[in-house]
From Swiss-Prot:
Protein role: Degradation of glucosinolates (glucose residue linked by a thioglucoside bound to an amino acid derivative) to glucose, sulfate and any of the products: thiocyanates, isothiocyanates, nitriles, epithionitriles or oxazolidine-2-thiones.
Protein name: Myrosinase MB3
Entry keyword Metal-binding: yes
Tissues where the protein occurs: In vacuoles called myrosin grains of a certain class of cells, myrosin cells, distributed in the cotyledons and the axis of the embryo as well as in different organs of the growing plant.
Subcellular location: Vacuole
Amino acid sequence: MKLLHGLALVFLLAAASCKADEEITCEENEPFTCSNTDILSSKNFGKDFIFGVASSAYQIEGGRGRGVNVWDGFSHRYPEKSGSDLKNGDTSCESYTRWKKDVEIMGELNATGYRFSFAWSRIVPKGKVSRGVDQAGLDYYHNLIDALLEKNITPFVTLFHWDLPQTLQDEYEGFLDRQIIQDFKDYADLCFKEFGGKVKNWITINQLYTVPTRGYALGTDAPGRCSPKVDTKQRCYGGNSSTEPYIVAHNQLLAHAAIVDLYRTNYAFQNGKIGPVMITRWFLPYDESDPACIEAAERMNQFFHGWYMEPLTKGRYPDIMRQIVGSRLPNFTEAEAELVAGSYDFLGLNYYVTQYAKPKPNPYPSETHTALMDAGVDLTFNNSRGEYPGPVFAEDANSYYYPKGIYYVMDYFKTKYNNPLIYITENGISTPGSESRCEAIADYKRINYLCSHLCFLRKVIREKGVNIRGYFAWALGDNYEFCKGFTVRFGLSYVNWDDLDDRNLKESGKWYQRFINGTAKNPVKQDFLRSSLSSQSQKKRLAC
């Protein structure tokens, strides 16, 4: 009888557990109560799922001890483009000398992974390995990696996070020339030899889409090339916004594939994995009842995601791109197509926001045309009814976020690209850099962003079977933000720009810590954040 009673109790507990699991709901919009956090924790993602944080070299290291890169050149030449505060990455978090504090904070978070990048010009100051390697740069990364491994934090290393050595840009315009393939390959070969015994997860290029579009179509990012009439203030040092983005993207894919082939051919014995990182967005029809808007959203998917994913899976560009772009779109030779197709063990996907899509005439050819116009799509953050997809993402950019977008993007990649192994390599939100220390630390907006996206991430894994193995919050700490300087903060830890040794977990960092530990609790509710309490009263309640 006791045995039967015991079995019945076990059954009831199991049933209750399953029921609780099935009843997980995710809020799509404010208020994000995150009421499901008692069952939404790291424990619900599997014991081998990696939860970490991310950063990049130019944004955190500072310029000490390395060669000049294109962001140095760009930010000094066009300071107004590098941030409205006219700041740059010359001095940022100074992680080059304060990396021990970074590792200490990751240990405090109980993070199990850290995605960071090598500064190419810190290891190879003049761009080409044949011109010399800086031992101090190698030692810096060895020390960092060793410290991570001591704390059981898995390193994910990005080889190129947009900071190309300036010498290669000066000599042959960087990714505009195929010479970059060999130089990138030589640099990667050095890194595999030097660090491959410790690093088992390699990323070739961060956000393949970004450098071609922002660096060569709009000129808003390094190296700052565009057609003369695209930047009316004449702040591009040359370029063709209609053709160069496609050439740069093509050479990036060829360089990526060459490096993956090198790793698989010469370093398979290291038992690691390698892949690229994509920036992703979800595109909703501006008017869901209008077939033209539905078609525009899918066309945008092809120009935004398919531009890289079709070559990486099939060895060719999307049919719609070949049809619209025509001769401006390079072709792969048969050998190149074979090399590019399948050149990844995993995909890193960065996700931040969702936008609405509606058709817009493509003005090509014209003096103000850019490759971004070829899709013939106008992107907005409001739909035909004037509705926004979710809460404010960045006040200065009038942008909004949509947590369920991460669900749709992951399902899209699973369905369209044969359910690849995926890591979420960036996901986060900015807060104003003008906030006081107390306001910056009490970042409940970031908690709501993180927990709402993690909820939908778990939901898509469970409901759709998407093969996601890790999540990296952006960012480890406040840092220099490309094109915004220090006017925004993305960190889970606070950095005092007047005293760089002053670094502490924000409320979001403490929440993420509890989430990783499996003890996450509800964040402070939105109604408190919007309450009529005076600023002093709020500070007192928050113990600032």
